[in-house]
From Swiss-Prot:
The gene is Shfl. GO terms for molecular function: ribosome binding; RNA binding; sequence-specific mRNA binding. Keywords: Antiviral defense, Cytoplasm, Nucleus, RNA-binding. This is Shiftless antiviral inhibitor of ribosomal frameshifting protein homolog. Its main location: cytoplasm. A motif (Nuclear localization signal) lies at residues 121-137. Residues 102-150 are annotated as: Interaction with PABPC1. It comes from Rattus norvegicus (Rat). Interacts with PABPC1. Found in a complex with PABPC1 and LARP1. Interacts with ELAV1, MOV10 and UPF1; the interactions increase in presence of RNA. Binds to ribosomes. Interacts with GSPT1. One of its GO terms (biological process) is response to type III interferon.
Amino acid sequence: MAQDGVELEKSVRRLREKFHGKVSPKKAGALMRKFGSDHTGVGRSIVYGVKQKDGQELSNDLDAQDPPEDMKQDQDIQAVATSLLPLTQANLRMFQRAQDDLIPAVDRQFACSSCDHVWWRRVPQRKEVSRCRKCRKRYEPVPNDKMWGLAEFHCPKCRHNFR
């Protein structure tokens, strides 16, 4: 039972990161329960728009509310949390930044050799991949020492830096 709660929490955080924190934790939890942690179904329901009736059901879902105080003091839950602590601590900063909508991003250059197309894209720092718009292949970024086209100009008159 507690393992299901941990998996649900991971799914909720993944969903919120996928939608850049625009989905509230309560709504994400209710949708994950409703669709059985099926990210495709949840994504479709969010994209196509949740019906007004379903929105009222989601806001009234008692399971999506914050856990009661006695649950926070439960020894079984504490034991599971302790056993999963190394995994959680390694990802805690990333999850907190995703929740605060502060996912670190970097500007990277991508190049497609098959269609001779080059583009720049701002991507999350932990997931630096992009898809070519012409041939739809996924590419890793060009290595930092091989990038071209990035420059910075310091204007001596207005003292503004242009990138």
